[in-house]
């Protein structure tokens, strides 16, 4: 399975084409739109979320509610394009018109793609960079992930997410599965402890009042994964490596870990390796899950636990020093409308990116021309965990 997105932040629409989805999978557009709505929420979001009400239109690959096995095309309209039609349209405009609209950007923002992207593609107007490098593109990726979540649900695989940390304010590292699932989306910062939620809101407000931004840590959990998905044979087929690449490809994500992650460096091996147990009902399982459900680049049947680190958003209302690329003079960087904290929304994006990587790995592991074939093969693999 693979996908390709297109579109700019203030262009007319985002488009995504997904190839490799099995035939006969029931798809309801409202299920995808429900996930799109989640991405737009969260404390600390900017004013654009009041303008955009993201919904998906499926224009190919689905007929009468079921996938055909052919490429699926989805479109997300940018409602804000009405205010940008001339400056972001495909039709040529004069230099005078461009200057009068005052949308040309020559002062790159530190921490953004502006300057390096301008160098790479020889853009003297850095808007040509920031329009595509914007996190607006993640709306299309969430649409893909939502499609994948429908697929995973049909395979009895659950995936969900939460916020672990914002600006140094931390929730617990781990919760049991039932507590986790029972408290999803209980508040607007997506943490389970309400007291910690208020402390996070206060931290976000403090950053906003200072014209600053803050980052954090999110966690994604995948449950009921069949064993042996991925590979120990080749580096590029290791499941944890593929998930890691997907996570750090999300805008502003700078780190990823699994299970106890970097804390494993602080402990002896006897406290980190997960002992192997067996009973006739479950088959093989682990007495703990310090490694986050992954051994040797493969799923081991335990919940896969993914932690992603998001840096503070680089667009600041008290901008840092930069240099005008035309005059080479020092200036404060350009200010674009932005969030003060997007960590709650980023947890949704991360969840859907992981959903795609999991679905892709499953479709490579098992024959998957149609959903019934895939369901049977995964059932056989689950039985192998008992019979081996």
Swiss-Prot record:
GO terms for biological process: amino acid biosynthetic process; aromatic amino acid family biosynthetic process; chorismate biosynthetic process. Homotetramer. Pfam families: Chorismate_synt. Reduced FMN (FMNH(2)). It catalyses: 5-O-(1-carboxyvinyl)-3-phosphoshikimate = chorismate + phosphate. The keyword Oxidoreductase does not apply. It comes from Staphylococcus aureus (strain MRSA252). This reaction introduces a second double bond into the aromatic ring system. Its EC number is 4.2.3.5. Pathway: Metabolic intermediate biosynthesis; chorismate biosynthesis; chorismate from D-erythrose 4-phosphate and phosphoenolpyruvate: step 7/7. Its cofactor is FMNH2. Keywords: Amino-acid biosynthesis, Aromatic amino acid biosynthesis, FAD, Flavoprotein, FMN, Lyase, NADP. The keyword Lyase applies. It comes from the Bacteria. Coiled coil: none annotated. GO terms for cellular component: cytosol. Belongs to the chorismate synthase family. NCBIfam families: aroC, PRK05382.1. The gene is aroC. This is Chorismate synthase. NADP(+) binds at residues 39, 45. FMN binds at residues 132-134, 251-252, 296, 311-315, 337.
């Amino acid at each position: 399975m693979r996908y390709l997105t297109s579109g700019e932040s203030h262009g007319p629409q985002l488009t995504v084409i997904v190839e490799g989805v099995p035939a006969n999978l029931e798809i309801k557009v409202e299920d995808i739109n429900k996930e799109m709505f989640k991405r737009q929420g969260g404390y600390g979001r900017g004013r654009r979320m009041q303008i955009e009400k993201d919904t998906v239109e499926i224009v190919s690959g689905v007929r009468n509610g079921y996938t055909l096995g052919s490429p699926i095309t989805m479109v997300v309209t940018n409602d804000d394009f009405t205010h940008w039609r001339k400056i972001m349209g495909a039709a040529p405009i004069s230099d005078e018109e461009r200057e009068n609209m005052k949308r040309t950007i020559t002062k790159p923002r530190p921490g953004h793609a502006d300057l390096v992207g301008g160098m790479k593609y020889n853009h003297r107007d850095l808007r040509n960079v920031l329009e595509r490098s914007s996190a607006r593109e993640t709306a299309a990726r969430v649409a893909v992930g939502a499609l994948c979540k429908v697929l995973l649900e049909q395979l009895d695989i659950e995936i969900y997410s939460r916020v672990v940390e914002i600006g140094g304010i931390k929730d617990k590292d781990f919760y049991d599965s039932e507590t986790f699932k029972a408290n999803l989306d209980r508040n607007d910062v997506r943490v389970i402890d309400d007291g910690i939620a208020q402390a996070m809101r206060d931290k976000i407000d403090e950053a906003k009042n200072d014209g600053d931004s803050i980052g954090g840590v999110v966690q994604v959990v995948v449950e009921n994964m069949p064993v042996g998905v991925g590979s120990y044979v080749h580096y590029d087929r290791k499941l944890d490596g593929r998930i890691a690449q997907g996570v750090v490809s999300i805008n502003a994500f700078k780190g990823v870990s699994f299970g106890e992650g970097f804390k494993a460096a602080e402990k002896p091996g006897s406290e980190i390796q997960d002992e192997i147990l067996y009973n006739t009902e479950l088959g093989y399982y682990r007495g703990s899950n310090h490694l986050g459900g992954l051994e040797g680049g493969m799923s081991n049947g335990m919940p896969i636990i993914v932690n992603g680190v998001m840096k503070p958003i680089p667009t600041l209302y008290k901008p840092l020093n930069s240099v005008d690329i035309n005059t080479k003079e020092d200036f404060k960087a350009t200010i674009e409308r932005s969030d003060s904290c997007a960590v709650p929304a980023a947890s949704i994006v991360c969840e859907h990116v992981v959903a795609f990587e999991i679905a892709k790995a499953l479709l490579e592991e098992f024959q998957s021309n149609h959903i019934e074939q895939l369901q049977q093969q995964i059932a056989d693999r689950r039985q192998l965990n008992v019979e081996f």
